[in-house]
């Protein structure tokens, strides 16, 4: 056994939970992801999906992808920088830019590669990056790849953000990067106050709208629109893998920023471009959410009903203001156990443990879709109450 294998062989935490029968990852789904999914020959209530708009199984989205494959083929066989740009990519970028009120947008192969490529491309040794300490892992990795000076502020603590800004050279670039919706806890960034501090300290703001797009604001434009900050956020990032029912991501900003990123973001230049099917499906989903406001209304009706039911049942759900509802467990082993008990009762939820959260903040994450019914929510709450009580969590 080589040194690398010897080192990695010591990692046996997954095997420990497998032996206990509570390992919760890589569960196989045998069909489309809707509010109920086929798993192991059984129907399971799906409350672990990020498909907030409920469009992953929509026939219009599927058909758009099929038509694109027939026209363009299965892949582009190159990066956007070389032979991998389709007119379809350009159309999606133009429509995304218009949707979020920016000059231009760039599409990346995944949401993760947006953040991990854009952040180091924008900053150098003389610049500062300031992040919320609960920002997504892709933001964390993006700043790790940057040569900039890096600061973190306590979660949604605006006094601490100001303290970090005061440490910066006033004549240097200061890039504040924040999740619009925090993906595990479901709470929102305090964008109005961040914007105030932006102006006070001459900073730049980048907002990750992965969980805000399709959910907040007019037609689901995002948290920035929810707060009425149309021209105050400098860079808007989003993904296609959630509300847009596909795979990929984008960054939108003014033309000078996009021109720089188009020629300097390494994950854009050196990655194969989005597949025709993924691009066309995202474009069709974007059209649907703009043309069907009732879908956003249904999402919030389901969300508000679920929030009410979970609160009434006595769950600790924190400060969530979104379709992401954390049910706090505060114990890693019990988090896995309650996930297994819920699954055995026919409810799919996701466990959240370190490093996705602090050790004392472990939880199971419930996520709502526009297509969830009150009956499905009631059944899920009933089963989760049973699972939590069995472990003396509730």
Please place each PLM-identified region on the residue numbering.
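N-terminal "arm"/small-domain region of PLP-dependent enzymes with the aminotransferase-like
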Residues: 6-74, 203
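Short loop-beta-helix segment that forms the pyridoxal 5′-phosphate
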Residues: 79-83, 93-117
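Conserved PLP-anchoring active-site segment centered on the Schiff-base-forming lysine
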Residues: 118-137
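Conserved core segment of the aminotransferase class I/II
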Residues: 235-237, 244-293
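Active-site phosphate-binding strand-loop segment of PLP-dependent enzymes
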Residues: 151, 155-207
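Conserved active-site segment immediately N-terminal to the catalytic lysine
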Residues: 202, 209, 222-240, 259-263
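PLP-dependent enzyme catalytic core of the Aspartate aminotransferase-like
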Residues: 59, 63-67, 71, 98, ...
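Conserved PLP-binding catalytic core of the aspartate aminotransferase-like
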Residues: 297-304, 311-346, 356, 360-361, ...
């Amino acid at each position: 056994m080589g040194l690398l294998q010897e080192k990695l062989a010591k990692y046996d935490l997954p095997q420990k939970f497998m032996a206990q029968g509570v390992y919760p990852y890589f569960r196989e789904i045998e069909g489309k992801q809707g509010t109920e999914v086929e798993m192991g020959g059984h129907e399971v209530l799906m409350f672990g999906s990020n498909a907030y708009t409920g469009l992953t199984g929509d026939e219009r989205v599927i058909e758009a992808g099929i038509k694109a494959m027939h026209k363009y083929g299965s892949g582009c066989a190159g990066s956007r920088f070389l032979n991998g740009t389709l007119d379809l990519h350009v159309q999606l970028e133009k429509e995304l830019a218009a949707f979020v009120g920016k000059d231009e947008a760039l599409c990346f192969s995944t949401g993760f590669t947006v953040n991990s490529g854009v952040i180091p491309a924008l900053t150098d040794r003389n610049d500062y990056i300031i992040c919320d300490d609960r920002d997504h892992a892709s933001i964390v990795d993006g700043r790790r790849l940057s040569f900039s000076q890096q600061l973190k502020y306590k979660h949604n603590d605006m006094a601490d953000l100001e303290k970090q800004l005061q440490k910066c050279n006033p004549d240097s670039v200061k890039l504040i990067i924040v999740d619009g919706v925090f993906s595990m806890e479901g709470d929102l960034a305090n964008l109005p106050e961040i914007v105030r501090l932006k102006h006070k300290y001459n900073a730049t703001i980048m907002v990750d709208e992965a969980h805000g797009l399709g959910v907040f604001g007019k037609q689901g434009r995002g948290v920035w629109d929810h707060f009425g900050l149309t021209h105050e956020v400098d860079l808007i990032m989003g993904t296609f893998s959630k509300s847009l029912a596909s795979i990929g991501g984008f960054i939108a900003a003014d033309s000078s920023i996009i021109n720089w990123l188009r020629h300097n973001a390494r994950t854009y230049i050196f990655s194969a471009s989005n597949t025709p099917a993924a691009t066309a499906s995202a474009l069709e989903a974007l059209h649907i959410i703009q043309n069907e406001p009732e879908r956003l209304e249904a999402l919030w009706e389901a969300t508000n009903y679920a929030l009410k039911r979970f609160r009434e049942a006595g769950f600790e759900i924190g400060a969530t203001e979104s379709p992401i509802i954390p049910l706090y467990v505060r114990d890693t082993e019990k988090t896995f156990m309650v996930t297994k008990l819920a699954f055995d009762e026919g409810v799919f939820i996701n466990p959240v443990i370190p490093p996705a959260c602090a050790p004392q903040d472990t939880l199971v994450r419930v996520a709502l879709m526009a297509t969830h019914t009150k009956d499905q929510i009631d059944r899920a709450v009933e089963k989760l109450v049973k699972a939590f009580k069995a472990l003396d969590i509730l």
